[in-house]
Each structure stands twice: as structure tokens, then as C-alpha cells.
Amino acid sequence: MTTNPKPIYQRILLKLSGEALQGSEGFGIDAKVLDRMAQEVKELVELGVQVGLVIGGGNLFRGAGLAEAGMNRVVGDHMGMLATVMNGLAMRDALHRAYVNARVMSAIPLNGVCDSYNWAEAISQLRQGRVVIFAAGTGNPFFTTDSAACLRGIEIEADIVLKATKVDGVYTDDPVKNPDAVLCDKLGFQDVLEKELKVMDLAAFTLARDHKMPIRVFNMTKPGSLRRVVMGEQEGTLIS
């Protein structure tokens, strides 16, 4: 049952992990998962919600792992940024096939492949009802795509950052290791820091906190969950 006839958010920043796109595959992009996610985003656009997207790159490349093996961290992070561009292009294509207008904006210039990130242009595109996919993270090494999601969310003045994961939200403890772990409905930023709960990395989290950007962590593998979040139904954990 929908509690609100209209969406409670006008503009959102949706953060998808790269792993979410690989579905049951061990690597790469699962076309079925990609198309399902594109359909869920399409539903939001049809509701009149403006959607900014940040996608991770972990399904294609993990810089941290190779850094441990001796690769220069900056090089690894640059490769990771390019992985997010590949995911962004795949998502744009899936959205176009679903008849949704979408643009990819990269934090590093890639002429002929996608647009370079431009704040004013991004706002203009969102207002026109286009989905804007922000690729290549922040454009800087040592910053995660969670940091990019919070940064872009703050820049475009989104109402909320929605972090789509494989778990139902934030638990009091690791639910895999501790069967008594409880799912939290609402948390304050300070609660998360004091209890050291895993929401996102500290740089991203403190950026959101300092700019009073609420975050909702929810399970996107459940069909319809994204729509439920936007319609104001209880789904996942709200941090504000």
C-alpha cells in the first residue's frame, strides 16, 4: 500500500554499486539486471522524479586489490574510474532502450565517448527530465564512488542520497556473523559514527553529515524497492 499519492522526493542521487550490476555473474555486467534497474529508474522518471546516478566500478575493476599487489594506487584508481565510465555507458544504453533520455557526464574528459561533468548543465538536464549519470567518481584518486555520490548529491541539491545495496539496510551488527543483529529504521549521523556502523567510508559519510544530506540505505535486489523508497514507504534505513 502506498502511503503517499505522490513521490516525497523531487530530486534524488541514486548510488548503485558495480557489484549490483553483475547479478549472479562473478564478473562484468548481467544484461537482465541492467535492464531491470533501467526499468526501475524509468518508473521514477514517469513519477516526475529527477534522477542523478552514480555507479561504482567494482564489477569490472578493483584498484585496492591491485594496489596491495604492488600497483601504484593512483594508476589503480584511474583504472577504477574508467570502469565506472563503462558501467555508466551500459546504463545509458539500457535507459535509451527503455525510452528514457539519459546523459553520461564524466569527471575526467573523454571526448567522443561522453560529456565532461558540468554542474550547470547537469542541473539543466535534470530539470528537463533527463537522467544524468555521473561517471569517473570525483575525478581524483583516493576517493570512493560513495564520496562521488555524496559530492554530486550535494552539488545538484538532491533531496537525498539513496545507496542501493544487497542488504535490507543498516544493522546493529553484521547480520551474517551475528543472528541477533537488528535492522535499524532510522539513525542519526552521530549514532553511526559512535557505533562504527558500516554505511559508507568516512570521507563520504562526513561530507554528507557536514552538508546535512540525508542518506537512505536499502536493498535494490528486491523488485519495486526503489519506487517504495521514493513514495515514502518504510524501506531500508534512513540516516539524517
Curated annotation (Swiss-Prot):
Any single Gene Ontology cellular-component annotation: cytosol
Alphabetized CDD domains for the sequence: AAK_UMPK-PyrH-Ec
Pfam short name (any one): AA_kinase
Predominant localisation class: cytoplasm
InterPro entries, A to Z: AceGlu_kinase-like_sf (IPR036393), Asp/Glu/Uridylate_kinase (IPR001048), Uridylate_kinase (IPR011817), Uridylate_kinase_bac (IPR015963)
Keyword set, alphabetical order: Allosteric enzyme, ATP-binding, Cytoplasm, Kinase, Nucleotide-binding, Pyrimidine biosynthesis, Transferase
TM annotation in the entry: none
Gene Ontology process terms (BP): 'de novo' CTP biosynthetic process; UDP biosynthetic process
Pathway: Pyrimidine metabolism; CTP biosynthesis via de novo pathway; UDP from UMP (UMPK route): step 1/1
Binding site for UMP: G57, D77, T138, G139, N140, P141, F142, F143, T144, T145
GO MF terms, alphabetically ordered: ATP binding; UMP kinase activity
Catalytic activity: UMP + ATP = UDP + ADP
Location in the cell: Cytoplasm
Binding site for ATP: K15, L16, S17, G18, G58, R62, T165, Y171, D174
Described function: Catalyzes the reversible phosphorylation of UMP to UDP.
Stated family: Belongs to the UMP kinase family.
Subunit text: Homohexamer.
Protein name in the entry: Uridylate kinase
Organism of this sequence: Photobacterium profundum (strain SS9)
Designated gene of the protein: pyrH
